[in-house]
Structures are given as C-alpha cells and as structure tokens.
C-alpha cells in the first residue's frame, strides 16, 4: 500500500482534500493510505506528497516553516523523487517568490513569481471565483482522460507565472491568460481546487495517485 502524506500546516481544507483523494483512490481501486500529517518523519518516508493551501502566500509559507516539514518534503521529493502535487496556494508556494504583501520566498521548485491577477476587463472581479475552463498547453500524465476545455473550480487573486514556459501544463483565462497547472519532473501544481471540481477533479487526483514520473 502506498502512503500519501497530505500536509497539515494550518492552511487548506484538509478534510475536503482527504475525502476527495480517498474517493479518487476508490474509483480506480487503488490501494492508498491517505494520511493527514505534520510529522516530518512520516513525510520523509511517504510514497507521495500532497500540499493544499488557502489564504495569503506569506502566511502559508510561515505555516509550512513552523511545522518543520519543509526539509522532510525536500528529502522525499528531491532526495527520493516521490511524486508531489500542490493545489491553490500549495501550488503557488512552488514558485521562487510571492509578491503578496511584499516579497516572500517560495520553495523555488518551479522558477517564477506569484503575481496578482490583473484582468483587462473592468467588469471582472478579483478574487477569481468559480468555474473556469482550462486549456491544455501540452500533454501530461496528470491530465490523462481530461478534456481540453474541462471546467475546474478556482478561488484565487494571484497566479504563478513560471520563468520557463516549458513548465506550464495548462492555462485559464480571467481577463487575460494565467497559469492553471505546472509540472517539472516529479513536481506538479494546480491553481484550481480539484477536490471541488467534480468528475474532472477526481480524475486528476486519481491520475496523481497513479503518476510515475
């Protein structure tokens, strides 16, 4: 049985994410133990790492540092090459830095900055809330069986802008395009909430549980 460490660092709707991961595993008949944890030892030994996150970039980074799990995550992801996925602010934390409330260092696992959305249509509001279509930029195992143009659920005021376009997997549009998904080697992140995105979101989570980068 594979162990999936769902990181508890004081940010993110953990129960919704846990429930969705369990349902995704059930639908594919996958033997996965979804563990909500802030235990560095468990994280370091996990077979997969999943990082949620809601709120401000700086507070999420501070919460991650306070738990002491960053080094364990780094050991698992870069030391052993286990698959990693971040969602919403967990996805944004992959960046080099976030520009919300000043400059806050990110994990720098995907080079780039997290910048505020600036729609070119004055009728569009921030935060960007609700369903939006994604455009797949390139094929990726995480989006296997998910249609180009699939609708996902977003709740964001900021977005990760990667320094290298080859790290972008999908985009969405809110008065201008922004990055909806990134992937590099065994690291991936999505700006939307797969746990709120119904069948397409569950398909993505199931793909993550089967992903072998």
Swiss-Prot record:
Organism: Caulobacter vibrioides (strain ATCC 19089 / CIP 103742 / CB 15)
Cross-referenced Gene3D superfamilies: 3.40.50.880
Catalytic activity: 5-[(5-phospho-1-deoxy-D-ribulos-1-ylimino)methylamino]-1-(5-phospho-beta-D-ribosyl)imidazole-4-carboxamide + L-glutamine = D-erythro-1-(imidazol-4-yl)glycerol 3-phosphate + 5-amino-1-(5-phospho-beta-D-ribosyl)imidazole-4-carboxamide + L-glutamate + H(+); L-glutamine + H2O = L-glutamate + NH4(+)
Enzyme Commission code(s) on record: 4.3.2.10, 3.5.1.2
InterPro entries: Class_I_gatase-like, GATASE, Imidazole-glycPsynth_HisH
Main subcellular location: cytoplasm
GO biological process: L-histidine biosynthetic process
Pfam families given in the database record: GATase
Protein's name in the database: Imidazole glycerol phosphate synthase subunit HisH
Pathway: Amino-acid biosynthesis; L-histidine biosynthesis; L-histidine from 5-phospho-alpha-D-ribose 1-diphosphate: step 5/9
Cellular component terms per the entry's GO annotation: cytoplasm
Keywords, ordered alphabetically: Amino-acid biosynthesis, Cytoplasm, Glutamine amidotransferase, Histidine biosynthesis, Hydrolase, Lyase
Annotated ranges, domain Glutamine amidotransferase type-1: 3-213
SUPFAM superfamilies, alphabetized: Class I glutamine amidotransferase-like (SSF52317)
Subcellular localization, as worded in the UniProt entry: Cytoplasm
